[in-house]
Every structure is written in C-alpha cells, then in structure tokens.
Amino acid sequence: MTKRQNRMTLVALLVIGVSLTGYLGLKAFNENLLYFFSPTDVTEGKAPKGKSFRLGGMVAKNSVKRDGVKVTFDVTDYVNTFRVNYSGILPDLFKEGQGIITTGSLINGIFIATEVLAKHDESYMPPEVADALEKAKNK
C-alpha cells in the first residue's frame, strides 16, 4: 500500500470508530433516561410498559397502608389516582397530602416503586409535580 492509501485507511477507521462510540454513547444515555408522568398520563396510557419511569403527584389522604416495610398508597393529581406498592423504608418527610416522586415500573396496572422521594419542606413542590397538578386542573 502507498502512503496515501495507508492514510485514507486510517482516516476511515477513525471515522468509523468515532461514529460507533457516539452511537453507543447516545444509546446508553437514552436507555437511562427516566421520564416523568402524572397519574393522568399513566391512566391515558402515555407511560412506557415494562420500562422504568417516574410517577409524581400528591399522596392521597387516607390511602397509606403499611405492612412491615411494605407500603401501599395512592398518588393523585386531583384528577386521577394511581395505586403504588413500595417495599423499603420511606423518607422521613413522607406523609399523606405531601408531594412525592416515585421511580419504578407499571406491572399489571399497579406501579411498583423502587424509590420514593418526598419534598423537603412545606413550601417546596418539585417542578414536575407542580406542572402535572396544574395541567390536570386545566383539563
């Protein structure tokens, strides 16, 4: 091979390598995204089936049922309510009427949470939850 052919081969391999690295990086990034949905979005079928996502809203009054570390509660956006099952220790700030965001997946119509995040003080509302509640009110 001539010097020029060697250089062209090297450039072609470099372009292929950079393209492959970019593709794999974007694919990994996309697979790790967790989209936020309100109970209304989940009820309307907008949430992914079999994939992890975030569900946010308010913990419905009189809905928390504890059985050891297993907890069942309802999350509402005041239009629709969705049942959540969680096994684990809840945050100290978790209580009925509080804004929360849960991470998990939908299995047989029940949201199985792997993580529960509660808002940090009385005046704070996670932006996603505030937007979802406002959107639900306007429907």
Curated annotation (Swiss-Prot):
Where in or outside the cell is it found? Cell inner membrane
Q: Which UniProt keywords apply?
A: Cell inner membrane, Cell membrane, Cytochrome c-type biogenesis, Heme, Iron, Membrane, Metal-binding, Signal-anchor, Transmembrane, Transmembrane helix
Which parts of the sequence lie on the Periplasmic side of the lipid bilayer? 29-139
What residues bind heme, as annotated?
A: 120, 124
Membrane topology category: Single-pass type II membrane protein
Q: How is this protein annotated for GO cellular component? A: plasma membrane
Task: Give any Pfam family that matches.
Answer: CcmE
Q: Which residues lie on this side of the membrane: Cytoplasmic?
A: 1-7
Report the family membership: Belongs to the CcmE/CycJ family.
The cross-references to PANTHER family, in alphabetical order and at most eight, read: CYTOCHROME C-TYPE BIOGENESIS PROTEIN CCME HOMOLOG, MITOCHONDRIAL (PTHR34128:SF2)
Mind telling me what this protein is named? Cytochrome c-type biogenesis protein CcmE
Q: Source species, please?
A: Ruthia magnifica subsp. Calyptogena magnifica
Q: Which gene encodes it?
A: ccmE
